[in-house]
Structure formats: structure tokens, C-alpha cells
């Protein structure tokens, strides 16, 4: 009887030892993309309340951080500097104050950002100033400084949470030259996404030995060539053709998507896209089981979360109330008077007073 008792005691201790060596880590990855200046829950163009915005997103973040704490990773996928007067005002009017977008993202504690084509469109003076104000890295593995041949921005960010190593690799659609004048991005070039991903995946594996790899790509999933030269939307191609990614966060095409695809190595990859204007979030849960620092299993699930289901953060609005008022005054400023009604509708079919007005102003200014 004594011997049996000792055996049971030994087995119990062994079980405790095994359990002590194993642990479960839960991560929450939240992605915003194509926010397009929708920082406040108010559309300064239509002068109506807006169902999206960083103010609503922050309510969601506050709630989730209470559960996940530092295991929540917040990422932005570009096209955040253009689209609303809020962005325009701090891009070109008030260039002395810290950029509002950077201040808000710092307040929300973003872990990394990514460049989008509309961020590039603001011009180097604007986006370099914004990047310089951000407390987090803005990534761009395929944005190359032509004078050095090296990335103009950090290619990736390595994060460690609860013993888990997570790498975020950032890339932008390479079709910038097809849309934007070179004076906006002079000194830079934009390399193919698949070639860049293949190169950096080798480096990341060798140097960082990550447990989780996330692609943060400002590009959609419907790949096609522009002018026979640029693969504008290569996110899905990268997910399928470059083994190593666990999650590919997409953007640029303003199309909601959440699905899993199989890569060439036979591994499942979650691809997810929250569309635009801060209306939807990419909400990804990653559960890892580890033993002695090695990953035994990995479960990845994603959903698209509507931000309208969350209220506006009062703390956020209070913190950025002065900037809101500055933008409101700017867009409310009287700049002239029409002697008769004017409509944009005729411009779709022929000559119009509206287009004449724009052309006259352009000629006067230039």
C-alpha cells in the first residue's frame, strides 16, 4: 500500500512538473487601415456625425486592454493622413503644432504603423514630419532610399509579449509611380512585394527566430499589373507564395475580408481587411501553447468588428477637444460668396461653372 501511495505521489509531482513547463499565451492583434482622416466621430465634409473614427476605436481598445493588457498589439496599415479636413489642417495649415494624427496614435499606444499611398501623396515634408512625431515605428520594407539602396523606413518591428516573439513586416503597394508625381516621393523607389517579402522572411527567420509573423501590407488581394510593371494588390500572393506568415493584414482596396488561405508549404494563413474610414476593425486572437520556450500549438482566429457598436471615448474627446475646435473654425471660415447656385452635376456631362471655378482658382494660384 505504501509503495502504491509513493507511485501516485511521484506521478502527481511529474504531472505538476509538466504543467509547470507548459503555458498558454493569448494575444490580441487589432488592425486599423485606411482611416482617411476620420479621427473624430464627425464628418467635417458632410457636417454629420460619423459611425467610425479613432474616438470609437479607442473605446474598443480601452475595453480589450483591460483583459489583454500588454498582450494587445495595435497596428495601423496606412492611408491615415488624407481624407478629412482634420488631416488636411495638420498637414498644411498648422505645421508648427505636433501633427494631430501622430498625437492621437501615440495616445492610443500604437505598436507600429505602415505607409499607404495616400500618406505618400501628402508629400515628403508632411509624412516625414508625421513619422518623426510618432512614438512607434512606421514600417516600409519595400520603400527604398535610392541613394543607399536600403529601406527608407524600418522594414519590420520585433515585439515580445509574455515570452512570445512577434515580428510585424510592413510593405506598401508598389504602384505609387503610376499615380503620384515623383516630386512627392523623390529619392525613393517602391519594390515588388513578393520579392521583398521573400528577402526579409529569410532575414527575419535567421535573425529573430519568431514565434509569430504578421504581414502588415497596404495592398489588397486582387493582384493585377499596372502598365505591365506594378503588382498593385499582392497581399494574397504573398500570403500564399511566401511561407512563414501566420497573419496577413491587408488594406488599400477598402474591401472587407476575413478568411484563411493555404500557402505553398501547406500551412494556413489568416488574411483580413477592415475596409476603410474607421468603421470596422481587424480583430485577431492568437492562442499559443508553449513548453520550454517552444511553440507546441498555435490557434489563430479573426473577425471583423464594427466600431459603431462601441461608444465614443470621452477621455479621447476631452484630450483632443482643442484640436477639434481648431479644425471646426477652419472649415467654417467664410472665403467668398456665390451670386447664384452652383452644382457639380453638369461637370459629368460637359462644361460647368463648378469646373470653371476650380480652373480659374488654379490659374490664379499658380
Regions found by a protein language model. Name each.
Residues 1-23:
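Bacterial Sec-dependent N-terminal signal peptides
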Residues 295-296, 300-366:
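Hard-cation-handling environments
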Amino acid at each position: 500500500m505504501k509503495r502504491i501511495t509513493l507511485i501516485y505521489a511521484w506521478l502527481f509531482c511529474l504531472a505538476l512538473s509538466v504543467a509547470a513547463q507548459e503555458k498558454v499565451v493569448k494575444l490580441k492583434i487589432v488592425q486599423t487601415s485606411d482611416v482617411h482622416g476620420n479621427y473624430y466621430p464627425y464628418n467635417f465634409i458632410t457636417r454629420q456625425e460619423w459611425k467610425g473614427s479613432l474616438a470609437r476605436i479607442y473605446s474598443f481598445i480601452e475595453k480589450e486592454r483591460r483583459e489583454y493588457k500588454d498582450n494587445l498589439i495595435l497596428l495601423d496599415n496606412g492611408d491615415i493622413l488624407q481624407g478629412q479636413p482634420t488631416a488636411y489642417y495638420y498637414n498644411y495649415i498648422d505645421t508648427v503644432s505636433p501633427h494631430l494624427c501622430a498625437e492621437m496614435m501615440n495616445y492610443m499606444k500604437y505598436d507600429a504603423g505602415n505607409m499607404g499611398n495616400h500618406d505618400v501623396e501628402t508629400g515628403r515634408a508632411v509624412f516625414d514630419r508625421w513619422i518623426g512625431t510618432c512614438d512607434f515605428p512606421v514600417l516600409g520594407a519595400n520603400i527604398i532610399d535610392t541613394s543607399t539602396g536600403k529601406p527608407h523606413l524600418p522594414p519590420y518591428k520585433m515585439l515580445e509579449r509574455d515570452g512570445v516573439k512577434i515580428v510585424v513586416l510592413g510593405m506598401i503597394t508598389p504602384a505609387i509611380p503610376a499615380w503620384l508625381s515623383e516630386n512627392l516621393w523623390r529619392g525613393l523607389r517602391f519594390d515588388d512585394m513578393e520579392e521583398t517579402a521573400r528577402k526579409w522572411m529569410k532575414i527575419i527567420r535567421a535573425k529573430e527566430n519568431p514565434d509569430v509573423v504578421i504581414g502588415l501590407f497596404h495592398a489588397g488581394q486582387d493582384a493585377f499589373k499596372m502598365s505591365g510593371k506594378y503588382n498593385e494588390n499582392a497581399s494574397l500572393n504573398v500570403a500564399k507564395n511566401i511561407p512563414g506568415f501566420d497573419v496577413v493584414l491587408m488594406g488599400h482596396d477598402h474591401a472587407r475580408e476575413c478568411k484563411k488561405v493555404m500557402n505553398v508549404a501547406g500551412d494556413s494563413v489568416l488574411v483580413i481587411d477592415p475596409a476603410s474610414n474607421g468603421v470596422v476593425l481587424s480583430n485577431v486572437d492568437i492562442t499559443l501553447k508553449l513548453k520550454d520556450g517552444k511553440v507546441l500549438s498555435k490557434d489563430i482566429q479573426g473577425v471583423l468588428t464594427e466600431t459603431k457598436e462601441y461608444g465614443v471615448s470621452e477621455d479621447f474627446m476631452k484630450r483632443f477637444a482643442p484640436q477639434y475646435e481648431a479644425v471646426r473654425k477652419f472649415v467654417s471660415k467664410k472665403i467668398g460668396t456665390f451670386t447664384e447656385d452652383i452644382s457639380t452635376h453638369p461637370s459629368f456631362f460637359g462644361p460647368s461653372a463648378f469646373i470653371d471655378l476650380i480652373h480659374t482658382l488654379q490659374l490664379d494660384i499658380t
